[in-house]
Amino acid sequence: MDIKNMIINNPLIKNMIDKKEVGWTNPKEMNYTEYEKKLPLKDQELKEAEERLKRFAPFIKKVFPETEETYGIIESPLEEIFNMQKELEKKYHTEILGKLYLKMDSHLPVAGSIKARGGVYEVLKHAEELAMEAGLLKLEDDYSILADKKFKDFFSKYKIQVGSTGNLGLSIGITSAALGFQVIVHMSADAKKWKKDMLRSKGVQVIEYESDYGKAVEEGRKNSDADPMSYFVDDEKSMNLFLGYTVAASRIKKQFDKKGIVINKEHPLIVYIPCGVGGAPGGVAYGLKRIFKENVYIFFVEPVLAPCMLLGMQTGLHEKISVYDVGIHGITHADGLAVARPSGLVGRLMEPILSGIFTVDDYKLYDYLRILNETENKRIEPSSCAAFEGVVSLLKYEDSKKYIENRIGKNINNVYHVCWATGGKMVPQEDMEIFLNTYLK
């Protein structure tokens, strides 16, 4: 790989190496009508994922009492954040046309992060397959029986493993332990202590690594492959995780319907999602595109210090390039996004549908968190706050400004902006106070 040459001919990568914030629009994005003719996933697969989660709802309701109100459906609020919108406009000298909403996956039941979607789904699917193969479960059963001792005894013979910077580990660990599986979570150096402590309190074995996320995943995969009773949840390559995330789209559609909001050409939707390895934002993006088609525009946001998806997509090298290859160290306060190498599976699935990617300086994550807390009395993880950079920077860069003018034009006044908060509910109070009092600039 001729990195030197690539940098000389690529001003965007040069800016990334210089740790400057950048905005990029995706030149490979396809016209939706053309894209629809060759969908990589069958709609039936998305529907099956939704149906499976419905089957498991009685079990979820039984073992996670916080889901009682929603009858075992794991979902988060969608709320307008008008005061935040006004404060962002004032502080960053910008105009946010349309209305700003927060999708609060930060407050999802069970695991308190977006990973409660894909992570929970993949564990449930694996459990269903094992129980059905053993003749213990039938499709027409009331799945609350999975909480019975005979199932726990059955699952206790099996192991589930995952590599994580934190939130996926929590999601897999909590769900697997509730079913009775033995669980091993391989955690990178970036993982927060409280996340490791919480997992251990639920009987999960946590293996810590001095190195980064990629190493934790690699070791976890190797460890699991050597054990015939072990199943590995692969954040870099898992289609089951991806499918679990897609279900978010049909859920947010129902939330819009309830609010009397119709997404169409005149009232488009722009969604900003923090991105690490890519699985969660990729799955959500794919689902949104299938439902809102050409009327939704999706931007990922990554830390300036770990912009792996941007590097992979912009060069077209995907998982074959790491931020280390261009001299970026990958160490960031956005611990949930501290990933050096992107998922190739997701990068390729995003090529025809993603609008673009922004990067954000670490210091702003804490600034955004304080503004959200002061204006809306809501608290989320610093990693989640990356989403706000998207809405603030949309018209800041020439590229994204032109993109919006060409695609949306005067309808920008009617846009529904959704910042996707990816985690935060489970952060201990004392850690949150530290976040709120962290100033990097």
UniProtKB/Swiss-Prot annotation:
Q: What is its EC number?
A: 4.3.1.18
Catalyzed reaction equations = D-serine = pyruvate + NH4(+)
What is one process in the GO biological process aspect for this record?
A: D-serine catabolic process
Lyase among keywords: yes
Q: In this chain, where does the modification N6-(pyridoxal phosphate)lysine occur?
A: 115
Q: Which Gene3D superfamilies match?
A: 3.40.50.1100
Keyword Signal present in the record's keywords: the answer is no
User: What UniProt keywords apply to this chain's record, in alphabetical order?
Assistant: Lyase, Pyridoxal phosphate
UniProt cofactor(s): pyridoxal 5'-phosphate
Which InterPro entries does the annotation name?
D_Ser_am_lyase (IPR011780), Ser/Thr_Dehydratase (IPR050147), TrpB-like_PALP (IPR001926), TrpB-like_PALP_sf (IPR036052)
MF terms in GO: D-serine ammonia-lyase activity; hydro-lyase activity; pyridoxal phosphate binding
Which NCBIfam families would you find in this protein's record?
D_Ser_am_lyase, PRK02991.1
Family per UniProt? Belongs to the serine/threonine dehydratase family. DsdA subfamily.
Task: Return the protein name.
Answer: Probable D-serine dehydratase
Q: What lineage is this protein's organism placed in?
A: Bacteria, Fusobacteriati, Fusobacteriota, Fusobacteriia, Fusobacteriales
Tell me the name of the encoding gene: dsdA
